[in-house]
Amino acid sequence: MTDNELREAAGQFFWWHSIRLRDNVVTPGISGENAAISVMGIPDDLTGVSVLDVGCWDGYYSFECEKRGADRVVASDIWETSGRDAFDFAHHELDSKVEPLESSVYDLDPDYAGRFDLVLFLGVLYHLKHPLLALEKIASCTKPGGRIIVDTIIDIKSQLNLQPVMIFHPGSEVSDDPTTWWSPNPAAVAMMLGASGCLEVTNVTRLYSGNRSVFHAIKASDAECEERARQEYKDRHRQIFYGPWPGK
């Protein structure tokens, strides 16, 4: 297939990202090539690292991690908006070893998905009705000491508020997008990640593209997560807590 034929074939699909398929062939993505990857803080060298890309869409970040030497990359999505054709097309043309996983974030389970050194959760959180549950699910698929990268819209008005705030959007208030449910402030993102089992949370890119922010979080050890859950149960039920920890 010539370069022109490849461009024509790629043009049949909807692309959010511009993915370089060959030196002279880039998919016609809405967001532009490499539009935001520089602010995500993804390590340049991923040699030996396992990666889970949650909400991968057309696979841009999954393929990029593969290029950076990741040992294993799993690309997870439900592909409900525009289907999986664009992902499959790029996967084939790049001769990629990325593993597609058709799963809702709410259904992610380490028993079948595994646990990973690096989990990407980019441009997904604010689209979900249940963001804390989603963070708990991706944290469960992160190895102890592993890194979670979250890219999300934030609430600008409460950006400097140290109290966690999350604005609910029942309609199309944000960028005329009815799929945006929430705008958390940075404190809310950090505290939700902490409640999901992360020890360290860093706001690595405080603001880009007007209302977006990037966070890195380090997953606690299994023992630390167990102790946190135990203490949280006691704290939240301290008035009625008389017996042993459930299951003990």
Which ranges hold each PLM region?
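Conserved alpha-helix/loop element of class I SAM-dependent methyltransferases that forms part
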Residues: 27-49, 64
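Conserved class I S-adenosyl-L-methionine
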Residues: 49-57, 149-171
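A short glycine-rich, Lys/Arg-flanked "PGG" loop and its adjoining helix->strand segment in the class I
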Residues: 132-147
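Class I SAM-dependent methyltransferase SAM/SAH-binding core
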Residues: 60-107
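A short acidic, Gly/Pro-enriched loop at the edge of an enzyme's catalytic core
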Residues: 110-119
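Core SAM-dependent methyltransferase catalytic element
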Residues: 196, 202-248
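Short alpha-helix
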Residues: 179-197
